[in-house]
Amino acid sequence: MLLFFALGLLIHFVFFASIFDIYFTSPLVHGMTPQFTPLPPPAKRLVLFVADGLRADTLYELDEDGNSRAPFIRNVIIHEGSWGVSHTRVPTESRPGHVALIAGFYEDVSAVAKGWKENPVEFDSLFNESKYTWSWGSPDILPMFAKGASGDHVYTYSYDAQREDFGAHDATKLDTWVFDKVKDFFDAARNNQSLFTKVNEEKVVFFLHLLGIDTNGHAHRPSSREYKDNIKKVDDGVKEIVSIFKHFYGDDGKTAFIFTSDHGMTDWGSHGAGHPSETLTPFVTWGAGIKFPQNVSAQQYDDEFLKEWRLENWKRRDVNQADIAPLMASLIGVPFPLNSVGILPVGYLNNTGLFKAESMFTNAVQILEQFKVKMTQKKEATLPFLFTPFKLLSDSQQLDILRKARSYIKQEKFDEVVSLCEELIDLALRGLSYYHTYDRLFLGINVAVGFVGWMSYTSLLIIKSHSNIPKGTRKEGKKPHCLLLYSFIATGVLVACFLMIQACPWTYYVYCLLPVPIWYAVLREHEVIQDLVESLLTFPRSHFVAYLLVFTLGIEVLVLSFFYRYMLTAGLIVFAGWPFLTQLWTRAKITFLSWAFFSLLLAVFPLMPVVGRKPNLSLVMGAGFLVLLLSLAVVTTLGKRNIKLVKGELLVLLLQMLSTVLSMYVVYSTHHSLLKKEGLPLMNQIVSWATLASSLVAPLLSSTALSQRLASILLSLMSTYLLLSTGYEALFPLVLSCLMFVWIQVEQETLQQPGVSCKQKLTSIQFTCDTDIAQFRQLCPDDIRRAFFLVFFLLTAFFGTGNIASINSFDLASVYCFLTVFSPFMMGALMMWKILIPFVLVMCAFEAVQITTQLSSKGLFLVVLIISDIMALHFFFLVKDSGSWLDIGTSISHYVIVMSMTIFLVFLNGLAQLLTTKKLQLCGKPKSHLM
């Protein structure tokens, strides 16, 4: 059986990894020829300001007094330059946002798993194409463009990462540091001939990354005074830097300025998803080569923003974020970034029709180059008779469009050139997408076939080893087995040869060959299949249909809960009424009334708001007091039942209660310290980490008696959970644990069925009891319900307090008791542990259910595995590659979550067994005893 689980884990890792090869492969290609506009550029230098985390509405709108928060930028919009909204794509994070701005392509999703701060995939950027680039700002952003540059012409100046502290007194210092360093730089340039020569060259870029607004947004929310004051500070800084440039270069009119943001921010201070507050960012540009403000009476945009911002009289020109890279390249005359998919927004250019036409033609050729390289790569890796080219853009069509465009330029039909080039770019981008997803259907079918085969084999294993289906007596010769084996070997060889001829990557061999041994294992069990068919034929058809409908409905409820959290509420309401429909409640009315009460109480949580809530310390404190009351109730109950606690175990229980009190104090103290902008107290940080470290050890010091050990696990994990809570979610594990304890009692009551031994008292059950394998019974239909309950409770633990499929459901304030300095991996790990704590509580309860129902954990686990795999197959087919970027990202994340859950179940099961069955001795004392 151990071999089966090891193979199962390996197979699920393959299925999990397949999504990265099918949907998460790098779209980048290499080997293109650089393309640049063959005319003198309007600017010699470009200054790029990126205000990290700045929302478009917060910058453009007027305050309560009717004044702008950024008067200099607003003056630019009205008197000097052009403006609009830059539309970002999901994920709205700093790295993909800057890659889109500076390199012109959207986040290479294959890089997500490889690194947060540096993009490990080689790509070209505006900085690489420039003669010199000087950049100032965050150490998280600048290095990835410097390391990706060829040569040493990209210079970076970063502050220490420790400055990125969400609990710091004043995050605007991050921005003033940048402005001060730029001023020092130009002071030094006046006295350094070598540097003076460099900054006076053409094709030079200055990049100012301003992180203060983002940091203040995370720490205080975008509606806060700190966030809005930071915008004013940035505006003042930009005004001063512009003045320095004009003074240094003698106001030569050869400097272009761009002010924008990498992403916005939600009202609750997070970003990453596709809410308009995250995807709508400001874009203001002025200076050399930029069109002056244009008064208009009507605009093409239907939204109400223009009236709210009182900018309806000034021409608004929206862009996609990747379009900014070709605009910057055009302004200073450098080659367009090789991997850019941005479309030059010619409406921003203040230049001749010829310059606009030539720039647009260059843009089209640059994107067409990528299409041609991608097509060549795919053609070379596919058998000629199997290759299907992109029909909308054949070689002859490419030549026709390019000749036509060049002819229009000679005839000075510049508007027609722009339209024709936009059409060519659209076709080339569609062609790029076509070749990028060329193998998707082929790989998808292979993975799906493997999935179905695995589920079939697992089902047959359950029927063979854990069911009462009668086995037929047949005598089979070895010949059919040999024939079957040789057939599958031949199939595998043919598949391998086919892949070898096409020079496919090694991962393709894994996805295409994996179904072969799986289906061989399925068809080898043809005797079990025959027994199953014969048994089903004797089973009442109406009962079979009813069971199938209930099972299908249950699976669909689980799947729908990923999209609609209220489906969990509906399920819990059904759970509450289940005992009353089956007459079970007449056996133990208090138990089943408790079951109904806690089911309905837990059903409230999925109806609560996912995010956007303000910190509510009173609810966290309330949860802490309830934990203390519960622990006192446990001690009292044990005393009433004459259960003696060993001195050491009583001490552990008291220390766990003290840990809960300390956690409450740390949460309260940290919250008020951050409000006063005094940062995270060191003692609070030490206590928090010590509590986290002890939470997995303390339960091992308690008694292994079922109720005592479960209470100890809850107390330990709740201390950590309180430290990671900011509001109502602190109550969630408490209510969930109460329901789990009642679930154990409910499952005991269901044992009063014919053929099942009488139940034991919970107080007499030990997690460490040596159960004879002969006592394990075979699976029955009720066990499928138990497995379904487990999966449902796991999903409730997952989505009960938020939709973690969306990255912006995370509130960074949750980790402020542990750290406030920006550290994505450490913060992510703490968030993950917060998510896993309810999981662990459910799995520990499931361990108890298995013991009380005398059921083999292997048999029940296999049923859970099948339910999870059916859900995973659902989401595999629901993955989208079209529609909004939010829909695409969400559909992929759902599949990843289910597959992760299936894989994690094995590890969580092991962790639950460790927490429930292992016992550490204190000073050589014996284990607790019952009286």
Swiss-Prot record:
- Respond yes or no to whether keyword Transmembrane is given for this record: yes
What glycosylation sites does the entry record?
A: 128, 192, 295, 350, 616
Q: How does it sit in the membrane?
A: Multi-pass membrane protein
Locations listed in the record = Endoplasmic reticulum membrane
Name the keywords, alphabetized: Endoplasmic reticulum, Glycoprotein, GPI-anchor biosynthesis, Membrane, Transferase, Transmembrane, Transmembrane helix
Q: List GO terms (cellular component aspect).
A: endoplasmic reticulum membrane
Molecular functions per Gene Ontology: mannose-ethanolamine phosphotransferase activity
Superkingdom field: Eukaryota
- The residue ranges for the Cytoplasmic side of the membrane come to 1, 464-480, 524-543, 587-591, 640-649, 707-723, 808-824, 880-894
Pfam name, any one = PigN
Q: What is its EC number?
A: 2.-.-.-
List where this protein forms a coiled coil. none
Q: Which cysteines are joined by disulfide bonds?
A: none
Q: Which residue spans belong to the Lumenal compartment?
A: 23-442, 502, 565, 613-618, 671-685, 745-786, 846-858, 916-931
Q: Further remark, if any?
A: Target of the inhibitor of GPI biosynthesis YW3548/BE49385A.
According to its UniProt entry, what is the function of this protein?
A: Ethanolamine phosphate transferase that catalyzes an ethanolamine phosphate (EtNP) transfer from phosphatidylethanolamine (PE) to the 2-OH position of the first alpha-1,4-linked mannose of the alpha-D-Man-(1->6)-alpha-D-Man-(1->4)-alpha-D-GlcN-(1->6)-(1-radyl,2-acyl-sn-glycero-3-phospho)-2-acyl-inositol (also termed H3) intermediate to generate an alpha-D-Man-(1->6)-2-PEtn-alpha-D-Man-(1->4)-alpha-D-GlcN-(1->6)-(1-radyl,2-acyl-sn-glycero-3-phospho)-2-acyl-inositol and participates in the eighth step of the glycosylphosphatidylinositol-anchor biosynthesis.
Q: Which family does it belong to?
A: Belongs to the PIGG/PIGN/PIGO family. PIGN subfamily.
- Protein's recorded name: GPI ethanolamine phosphate transferase 1
The scientific name of the source species is Mus musculus
